[in-house]
């Protein structure tokens, strides 16, 4: 059977990606109405201002669209560095969404990594490695997706 990625990562983005051959499962995980959280670490050029942090948390206007609110925390914003590390959790996953959110606020994303899809993390995996999800993990994702639908 054909195995395909569940969702996508931009060419310049690394991190967690689920692969599946189940079309129904893929739709459950990728459709925004199911509210499956994806967590990223973004390294942005410049210091993230408080007012921009608030905008990220309430939704960013991109063209004629306003994103859903993101859960955002500053991981590292040293005085000596001109860059900021930010952890964001979103559930929409539109094309280049995080990069476009920061660009709309005047920041360049220098590096972007998806750390987690819901509770599934990269913990214990090196770059390029993979593992098979347990039945419990798959059921948990399906339950979350079904409960997230409004």
Label the model's feature ranges:
Residues 1-150:
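Basic, flexible Lys/Arg- and Gly-enriched helix-loop patches that mediate nucleic-acid binding at interfaces
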């Amino acid at each position: 059977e054909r195995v395909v990625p569940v969702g996508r990562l931009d060419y310049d983005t690394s991190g967690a990606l689920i692969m599946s051959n189940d079309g129904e499962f893929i739709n459950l995980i990728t459709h925004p109405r199911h509210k499956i959280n994806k967590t990223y670490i973004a390294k942005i050029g410049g210091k993230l201002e408080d007012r921009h942090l608030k905008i990220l948390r309430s939704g960013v206007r991109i063209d004629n669209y306003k994103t859903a609110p993101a859960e955002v925390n500053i991981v590292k914003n040293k005085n000596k560095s001109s860059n900021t590390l930010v952890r964001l959790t979103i559930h929409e996953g539109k094309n280049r969404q995080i990069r476009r959110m920061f660009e709309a606020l005047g920041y360049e994303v220098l590096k972007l990594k998806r750390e987690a899809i819901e509770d599934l993390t990269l913990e214990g995996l090196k770059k390029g490695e993979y593992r098979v999800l347990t039945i419990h993990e798959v059921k948990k994702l399906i339950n979350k997706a079904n409960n997230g639908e409004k």
